[in-house]
Amino acid sequence: MTIAERFAEFLMGTRYDEIAVQAVDHATMIVASTLASAACGRHIDSSRIVSEIEIQRGGTPEAAVWFEKDIRLPVIGAARANALMSDAAASDDSDLRNIVHAGTPLTATALAVAEATGAGGKDILAAIVVGYEAAGRIGESIMPKFDYRGHHGCMGAAFGPTIAAARLYGLTAEQAAHALGLTATTIGGLTKAANTSIAREYHAGNATMAGISAVQAAMRGYTAELAIFEKERGFCRLFGGSDGSVILEDLGTDWDIVTDMALKLVPGGHPYHALGEAGANAAREAEVAPEQVAKIIVSRPGMKNLTGPLHPKNLIDMAHSPAYFTAAGVRDHEFGWIHASQEKIDDPVIHTLIDKVIVGPEPTENLAAYRQGATVAIEMTDGRTVANTVFVPNGAGCLGVDWADVDEKCRALMPAAPLDDVKIESVLSKMRQFRTLSHASELTGHLV
């Protein structure tokens, strides 16, 4: 059997009651987190444009466009529009290995297909867990060369919606293997486009469409090259220089949604969260005022210089500016959702501190412990120095995620939808009961 066939057998054959409780909890949290990010992103131009396109295109009313009253579209159109909403706000989740936002296309796909098929809470959550496993393992099989070569993380993320849709549409393992093959030959994306433009969230929509389209074709008998992952000049060889065998290693011993997933509990790019967190921790510990700062030294494995925009002017700049995260954390002794606001992005005190951020020597100890982690040292004008290290950012599944933090995120972002306090609490109540829902519309119906 090929890698695709063996992997599909595992992904399609795993039952809900065989999945660890923590994995199911994290899947539920991903749904809540994705909806919160979507509420914040629905008015961003990229999201608005794609929603308008899909609404104008129309078609069979199978699934809801989130936060839109009485607008239902074909599964693929609704899922694409909803994925763009969430990814546009850059406030969803990440795989700590490669910063792929796997949860957004997964949630958008799972809820849309479930609305069309009548699937309930347990089936949706199982589809998200195994979909995350598909995205994570296939993404890992092409690390790190896919990134060095300029390919975007959607190269792995697309396999999440593929498997989620395959399960919820009721495909056989063989059909799912062909769907994986079709997705492998479809998906593409460039990191350079994503780092500096709204093409980033366009990738999320493409990953969602690629997965659903592959499944809808495979369920009707469309076939693909089943050896596409291990074949010479196939997916893994071409994008990662590997034989793809890592995809099948130790299947079922743990779940990527537990070991490698991280929810965003603050805005912006996940690689920079630890910088904001460590900067805030250090400044708070020593009660550092901005005018006392002489120099801010940042370090992490592999960090040679400050990347991204040094002085951000907008949300896209802010999301990719490690200097901003660091300076904002030092300035305010915390880093939170408020730091995605234009008021904070324009804060002159933060910009003064940005000019004091420099890159120090790379750490030499505990290198394996740095999972998107960082160390920040603040040198003060009186000669004192205070430092803090964050090995793994808050919100990482491996640290455990508290529902209170997810609730806080939803309460902070969902008013932008807009949803009032009563609606938000209703959504949060449904999330806590998600396992018992008999139909996805019991949740999506509360989003208007």
Task: Annotate each language-model stretch with its function.
Residues M1-I99, N195, A199-M209, S213-V448:
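Terminal-appendage/accessory-domain detector
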Residues V24, T28, A32, L106, ...:
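Hydrophobic face of alpha-helices
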Residues T34-L35, L106-V113, I128-A135, A158-Y169, ...:
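Buried hydrophobic packing segments
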Residues A83-G139:
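Hydrophobic alpha-helical hairpins/lids featuring a short glycine-rich hinge
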Residues H101-A102, H151-H152, H273:
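Histidine-centered active-site/metal-ligand motif
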